[in-house]
């Protein structure tokens, strides 16, 4: 019986987290109360306090349990990084954009991060959250280094500069789409969007065209 009670408590805790995601995305973190979350979950406010001491604790737990986007996506083509690093990176970027476009929960999380949150000192910082769920500098930097080793990118390529530009480009793309999802179809246009970004910043020879590159000065 105790085991069942523990399982039920865990289900309630997860229900509160899912309800918080919905409410934060809808109302904004600042404007959402624990009563709003309790009502959305169909429980009492007291039940919320049994699991979380505050809205901030609930907010932090919501992000701490969220797996990185790279662990959630499934590229349409499985390409080995060592063999075709740039194409493998392309497929990962496309799969990431399509996952955000097609998955309501992930879209809600992106809305919270980019549009619905004013961070305070006791909350996980925006930087920490991005490091947890988003752009992985280490992974992508390793793939770009592999491109250099395979002579896909020139030896003088400035990897750090490419990482900065890629991160800025994809963050801006997602932010703009969230502001007006009807303006363009992120899911359908993901391949073209990725190809254009990569062609500008990392000499993407994906279509046989001339290479552009950012190099060390």
Model-derived segments and their meaning:
Residues 71, 75-76, 83, 87, ...:
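Amphipathic alpha-helical packing segments from all-alpha helical-bundle domains
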Residues 9, 17, 59, 63, ...:
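Amphipathic, non-transmembrane alpha-helical scaffold segments
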Residues 61, 75-106, 159-166, 206-217:
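Hydrophobic alpha-helical connector segments
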Residues 98-141, 152:
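Short secondary-structure transition hinges
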């Amino acid at each position: 019986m105790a085991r069942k009670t523990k399982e039920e408590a865990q289900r309630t805790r997860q229900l509160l987290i899912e309800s918080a995601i919905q409410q934060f995305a809808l109302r904004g973190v600042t404007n959402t109360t624990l009563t709003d979350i309790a009502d959305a979950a169909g429980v009492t406010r007291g039940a919320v306090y049994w699991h979380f001491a505050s809205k901030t604790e609930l907010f932090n737990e919501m992000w701490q349990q969220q797996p990185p986007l790279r662990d959630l996506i499934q590229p349409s083509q499985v390409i080995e990084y060592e063999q075709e690093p740039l194409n493998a990176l392309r497929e990962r970027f496309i799969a990431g954009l399509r996952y955000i476009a097609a998955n309501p929960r992930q879209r809600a999380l992106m809305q919270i991060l980019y549009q619905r949150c004013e961070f305070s000192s006791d909350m996980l910082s925006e930087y920490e959250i991005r490091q947890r769920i988003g752009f992985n500098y280490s992974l992508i930097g390793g793939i770009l280094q592999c491109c250099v080793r395979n002579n896909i990118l020139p030896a003088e390529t400035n990897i750090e500069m490419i990482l900065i530009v890629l991160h800025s480009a994809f963050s801006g793309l997602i932010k703009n789409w969230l502001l007006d999802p009807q303006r363009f179809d992120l899911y359908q246009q993901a391949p073209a969007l990725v190809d254009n970004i990569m062609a500008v910043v990392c000499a993407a020879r994906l279509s046989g065209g001339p290479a552009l590159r950012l190099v060390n000065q």
